[in-house]
Amino acid sequence: MAESEGSNTENGKVGAVKSENLDRGVAAIKNQFLTTKEKFHAFIDADGKDVTEKETCSELSLNDAENTTRTENAAEPEAKRIKLDDGSSEGQDQPPKTAENKQEKKRARGQNKSRPHMKHSQFEENKLCPSVTQECASKCFFGDKCKFSHDVAKYVSQKPEDIRPNCHLYETFGKCIYGVTCRFAKSHLGEDFKNIINEELMKEWEGKVLVKNSLDKSLKEQLRKKKVVFEKSDKYLKLCFKSGDSSKMKNPVVKEDSAVQVTQKDSPITTVGAVTDEDVIKLRPCEKKTIDFRNKLYLAPLTTCGNLPFRRICKRLGADITCGEMAMCTNLLQGQPSEWALLKRHHSEDIFGVQLEGAFPDTMTKCAELLNRTIDVDFVDINVGCPIDLVYKKGGGCGLMNRTNKFEQIVKGMNSVLDVPLTVKIRTGVQEKVNIAHKLIPNLRDWGVSLVTLHGRSREQRYTKLANWEYIDQCAKIASPVPLFGNGDIISYEDANRALQTGVAGVMLARGALFKPWLFTEIKEQRHWDISSTERFDILKDFTNYGLEHWGSDCQGVEKTRKFMLEWLSFLCRYIPVGLLEHVPQKINERPPYYMGRDYLETLMASQNVTDWIKISEMLLGPVPPNFTFLPKHKANSYK
């Protein structure tokens, strides 16, 4: 410790940016790694080539600030940038502040709600017909009217160069279903551009289901034509309408017959052959599947970033419970494929749930019944914590906390049609200083909820202040014996330990998992992992491979993988390596200043400029296509 303190003092004399000069809310980093914005971007733009063999990244940051100027615009606004006062501007004439200058320095807050999205046609102009790609024996159904190309040779001549010489899908499964359209096709194409198949490797995967919960075509048609029958939901909803206000209803659960009565009423036809379930008695509430949630690490259902490849990363690094992204119940009932894609489950997710959002008992109950008989999940979660206006103004998300009667009907209705546990995720309240969760939790316990997850912030508060763990502790005691999980500001194993010292049954990780998915490993092994840039890059490699498996290895799949990687990199860049911190651990509400990493890759990963995120994606997924545009979900940076 004494040695490191001495080196910090010495570096401070040379002219490094001192940590004590940092603004409030900025993470404290060792002096030898701190730098200025100009030096940081100059180093990134030069690809680290200006560093000699004897000169390290940290030594570069000790040069005088006046000798380094940024030669081009970084394409980033002043929003969320930390101004480091290194004294270089003292005594210089500054231009008068005008209205235009004030406008430029205006902070960009919130989300980019109307983001540009690249259409499928923009990925490749000359798209090959699926009948050719899949090497179908029969001719194209559309014949001469087909709008896609059937000329394989022409397609290959216009196709961009392969990204890598080896295809992950072919090397893993023995066959790449994308054939000639694969961006790694040379490794599995034979004569006349025919797909090569590794029969031995394919046999190893034969009969195994890797991803569950796909939308069946026949079910999609039935949903769109409104031909699906919801027998249980209709019974429950009739009871609700008859009794009117749910507060007058003692127990609005569908009346169930005893096992003896069911066997007497139903006389199923005797079947021959495989065992069927026509004569199986449905589970009663007391016989529902139970899950021991206690002392498990729960990955939060994260919109956009909580996709299946990311969940696989977290699962491999120690997550116990995973949950799909928030799905709108009305969209599911309409059979929208994009919404059903959010329910997909990888076989490695052993405790997996789906999260539903809705504002009315009829749609939520019907959706629960539909999922109960069509997909494989371990629990269903109700989103009562979503703060966005689109959901809240319709009465969903946080809005349900103020609509107790409707909330009760939704919970009891879903419970009556589900064979798996029903869980609820809530916030402390809607208004910043008005906590109402403690009033709601006893009702949730009485309504039959199996788990409550409490985010220690209100809707209005968002992330402006730290989560209120004292209040979470109070609510956990009220919820007993129902387990309550706490959520908020956990970014190290020490934070998790402090949280578990309260009355909570476990912790949910959200932003902490986005910043550092190896947080699950740190908590289980009770250590601070000073992960290297190479190890972090290997995690991105795994995400790339998982993305190609999930979204495809053709042009469209590659660009989808890139899109979600860029969204994730907007969070990953906020991680500060343990070896650079003056005080371990990093605090989630502290912004990282400009610093030089221990190598070029670590410095590149620290950049909050979207052009540098794209540079990282190009290391894994090749160059971006022409006219590529990307606007992050949050108003931090943009690339056009």
From Swiss-Prot:
A zinc finger (C3H1-type) spans 123-153, 161-191. It catalyses: 5,6-dihydrouridine(47) in tRNA + NAD(+) = uridine(47) in tRNA + NADH + H(+); 5,6-dihydrouridine(47) in tRNA + NADP(+) = uridine(47) in tRNA + NADPH + H(+); a 5,6-dihydrouridine in mRNA + NAD(+) = a uridine in mRNA + NADH + H(+); a 5,6-dihydrouridine in mRNA + NADP(+) = a uridine in mRNA + NADPH + H(+). GO terms for molecular function: flavin adenine dinucleotide binding; mRNA dihydrouridine synthase activity; RNA binding; tRNA dihydrouridine synthase activity; tRNA-dihydrouridine47 synthase activity; zinc ion binding. Residues 43-57, 77-86 have a biased composition (Basic and acidic residues). InterPro entries: Aldolase_TIM, DUS-like_FMN-bd, tRNA_hU_synthase_CS, Znf-CCCH_4, Znf_CCCH. GO terms for biological process: mRNA processing; regulation of translation; tRNA dihydrouridine synthesis. Disulfide bonds: none annotated. Pfam families: Dus (PF01207), zf-CCCH_4 (PF18044). Its EC number is 1.3.1.89, 1.3.1.-. Residues 104-120 have a biased composition (Basic residues). Its cofactor is FMN. The active site is at C386. Keywords: Flavoprotein, FMN, Metal-binding, mRNA processing, NAD, NADP, Oxidoreductase, Repeat, tRNA processing, Zinc, Zinc-finger. Residues 1-23, 43-123 are annotated as: Disordered. Belongs to the Dus family. Dus3 subfamily. PANTHER family: TRNA-DIHYDROURIDINE(47) SYNTHASE [NAD(P)(+)]-LIKE. This is tRNA-dihydrouridine(47) synthase [NAD(P)(+)]-like. It comes from Xenopus laevis (African clawed frog). The lineage of its organism: Eukaryota, Metazoa, Chordata, Craniata, Vertebrata. The gene is dus3l.
